[in-house]
Amino acid sequence: MLDRNPGSNLADLYRALPVTWASPTMSPYCDDEVKYAVVEHTIERFWTMRQEGLPIAGQKIIDLTTVNGVRVTVEDGTWGLVRASSNKPELVVVVESPVSGARRHAMFEAIDRILREHAEVGAYNQSL
């Protein structure tokens, strides 16, 4: 990177990076026997919301990526990810916003409301 920016030092390159508000990896308990079904339901809910033009976290869904779970992205670039852990009885939830901590929190709350439709989804190991 430095060789492509000969007039800059590492501190300059770091300062030029965009600011984002990212969550830690949050993992609610979910039994191995049901976690994949919970993720599939979450994918279906996001697809339905997108098809019906319903917002998530107050914004239009602009992209859904369904590789190994689901990543939902809204108009302002805020996104949330839900997937099943490959080696623990839990889900993995991550959210990030290029706009603000409030937008990150709104995405987390919206995803959590969908996950809470399943009684099998337990407490998070950490939260925002």
Task: State where each predicted segment sits.
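Phosphate-binding and adjacent anionic-ligand microenvironments
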Residues: 1-86, 90-94, 99-128
